[in-house]
Structures are given as C-alpha cells and as structure tokens.
Amino acid sequence: MFLKLLDKLGRKKVVLDRGPSHPRFDLAKPWMNRYYLIFRHRPKWFPFNILIHEMLADDHGDGVHNHLFPYITIVIRGGYWETTKKGKFWRRPGYIGFRSANTHHRVDLKPGTRPMTIFIAGPFGLRKGPRSESVSYTHLTLPTMVQV
C-alpha cells in the first residue's frame, strides 16, 4: 500500500535494463522499480538520499559495476546473490551492507523473485576509477559461494 502511495505521488521510476543510447533500446525491459523516499532528483550538494529498490531482473551482462557514491543496502524482502571479488554471497532479509563507491559487485536473483531493499545513497564524487569492469566473476563455483 505504501509503494502504491509513492507511485501516485510520482515517487516511482521504472528503470530499464538499457538506456536510450543503447543500439538495441527497442529490446529494453524493466530491470528495477525505484521508489524515492526523499528526493526524486537529488541535488549534487545534498549528502544522501533514501530509496526503496524492488529488483526485477539480474544485473546486466557478466561483469561487475560500482556506484557514483558510497551506499548502505538493507534487504527487506526476498534475497539475492551478490558477487564481489571475494566470492558469491547470499544476501537474505535483514542483511545490511556498507559499500564504498569503489566496491565492484553484481546482483543476481533467484528465478521468480522480486527482492526489495532500502538503499541509502551517500555523497557524490567519491568514486575513483571506472564505473564497471568487464571482468566476470562467473568462474566462482558453488563451493566458493557463502551464505551470509
């Protein structure tokens, strides 16, 4: 009900799995529902924002990415696999993760699930280095996966 209210207030954004500059934008599909609890368009000078993320699909491709800012993520529904340089970990409800802007990761969902998180974005401008790495951590096999 709360999410429906946010939608009616114009606080929901459906994020697609590719942007309009992508050569196959015609194949774009919903990737995440994003609900803004504070700013729909956060000013660069404001130090944080709070959002609810409802994940609809795995992160794109095989590589990993980071964010423009440090962040905190709190899993409030479902769960997901997070792959980092340290391995592949199950993030269950109640999990709280603190990440720097330089932490590369990817998120993969269990089929048929729609995990939800509270996402607290920190200040802009703290990332050093590239946004993504084409490096794939898919070589991590089940024995290296850890449930946290």
Task: Describe every region a protein language model picked out.
Residues 82-83, 104-110:
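Short beta-strand His + acidic residue motifs that chelate non-heme Fe in jelly-roll/DSBH
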Residues 68-81:
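Short, conserved beta-strand element in jelly-roll/cupin
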Residues 85-102:
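Short acidic-glycine-tyrosine-enriched beta hairpin
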Residues 113-128:
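A short hydrophobic beta-strand segment most commonly corresponding to one strand
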Residues 1-49, 85:
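A short, N-terminal "cap"/entry segment at the start of jelly-roll beta-barrel domains
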Residues 138-144:
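Conserved small/polar residues in nucleotide/adenosyl-binding loops
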